[in-house]
């Protein structure tokens, strides 16, 4: 990745920022997906054909026509085929700009979000805004699958390497779902920690649990955005294991009132956005 690309140097991440409380869609900042996909060799043709960056926006407020504050939670899904991902701090600042702005209805807020986010992402974005009474009925869930975290192994290196996946696929063809809650990477710009859980559903040669866990732990000091980490995991698994079918889904903990949950697959649809215990 070109860390000197102007789209990265212009980001507000890590900079002192003025918080605006009047609606301002120009606060949104895009990051071209090709910056990371070029390095993975997947800009022209991605190994996944389904997916989205699913965001939960917990800090959404505006004024109704009488000036009374309103609060809600929004689910946002940015299609993986969009030209850009959306930088998270700019997303937060953009949401803050709704605070002192009057909107006629919740639906008008939803429409504004969809329009602005689609323009920034240069692609399809779906938005659903929920009243709190609707959202509180949603359960807290866990990833289905076998958790691979309780292995008695020694790890003394935390430098990212996909070589941990060498010979990771061995034995009979299986369909299974593996889960780890030990995914941790760092923000590409600020190096702040990003904590997440990852689910890998595949049909292919059975994966060696120890090698897979070592690979996932090697992200611990790795600097990339959430979406980029998931695409890297997907691409590495395709390269090293050549599965018949593959899904990689990560759910990251909240920062600044936002959580990001990238989903990539070559055979499954994007699931319902249900939060986990750490979210």
Curated annotation (Swiss-Prot):
Substrate binds at residues 86-88, 226-227. GO terms for molecular function: preQ1 synthase activity. Its EC number is 1.7.1.13. It comes from the Bacteria. NCBIfam families: QueF. Belongs to the GTP cyclohydrolase I family. QueF type 2 subfamily. This is NADPH-dependent 7-cyano-7-deazaguanine reductase. It comes from Actinobacillus pleuropneumoniae serotype 3 (strain JL03).
